[in-house]
UniProtKB/Swiss-Prot annotation:
Gene Ontology cellular component terms for the protein in this record: host cell membrane; membrane
Membrane-spanning ranges: 11-33
Keywords: Early protein, Glycoprotein, Host membrane, Membrane, Transmembrane, Transmembrane helix
Highest taxon in the source lineage: Viruses
Topology of this chain in the membrane: Single-pass membrane protein
Places the protein is found: Host membrane
Protein name: Uncharacterized protein DP60R
Induction (record text): Expressed in the early phase of the viral replicative cycle.
Residues carrying sugar: N40, N57
Length: 60
């Protein structure tokens, strides 16, 4: 069992790094590659509109 544990830990750490760090890297790199104005418009469309829809659904 002791010989099996080190590879499992390595695989787990690699899976955690690829699954957790790469999305964060993309979230920082992708907006930086795009123009600032497009980022602002996309953020408003993605975040502000859904919130208004959620509020309307809750009120009904």
């Amino acid at each position: 069992m002791s010989s099996i544990w080190p590879p499992q830990k390595k695989v787990f750490t690699v899976g955690f790094i690829t699954g957790g760090v790469t999305p964060v890297m993309v979230s920082f790199v992708w907006p930086a590659a795009q123009p600032q104005k497009k980022i602002n418009y996309s953020r408003k469309k993605k975040y502000f509109r859904p919130r208004s829809f959620y509020k309307k659904n809750v009120s009904f």
